């Protein structure tokens, strides 16, 4: 019951900033509840397949998704994530703590770049062979990162969609939500085959975070933008710090 309560409180924060928060889930599961890091990674990533559905549907209705690009990136991300999950079993638990923390710090830096530095670029034709090739590369790279370290890689995907595929910020955010679904499914299957998904824990995490996110989303439009942007940046940074303890 305590796990559900903690995940509910975390869900409020994640709903407020509009993030999947896999890194924070991993940090809390390992630090507070002493869940083995491999199980925390697998359970967290598998859970994202469910939590991303509602967000992707909402963005689809708002016209924020480049469907063809999203399906290509997502399809190859699923493959990369599956093999990334397999790779995790060869990484010692102590080392995995530090590697995942490092990825979260890098994620925070990329978020900082996206929110405060990166400028909007005009969108170009998305139907060239070169575009599809870059989409495949982005999908595989993001998938391997997510599968190996159990995080959603949303900042990596968003930055990649903007820089490599010239998507607008709005379309990069929406398309990322679509990409994360097959990515999480592929990684989740990989972790399941390695025995790193705790189904009871998965249900507790989902119940807590999804209920909390519903509440937290109601506060998003009530806060000043500077508070929201700061929270989006600080969330993975704090999660990375927690993993170091």
From Swiss-Prot:
State where the protein is found: Cell membrane
Protein name from the UniProt record: Probable membrane transporter protein YdhB
PANTHER family hit by this protein: MEMBRANE TRANSPORTER PROTEIN MJ0441-RELATED (PTHR43701), MEMBRANE TRANSPORTER PROTEIN YJNA-RELATED (PTHR43701:SF2)
Q: What cellular component GO annotations does this protein have?
A: plasma membrane
Q: Which organism is it from?
A: Bacillus subtilis (strain 168)
**Where is the signal peptide, in residue numbers?**
none
Membrane spanning segments where? 1-21, 34-56, 71-91, 98-118, 137-157, 177-197, 199-219, 225-245
The annotated topology with respect to the bilayer is:
Multi-pass membrane protein
Pfam families recorded? TauE
Per the record, the similarity remark reads:
Belongs to the 4-toluene sulfonate uptake permease (TSUP) (TC 2.A.102) family.
Q: Which UniProt keywords apply?
A: Cell membrane, Membrane, Transmembrane, Transmembrane helix, Transport
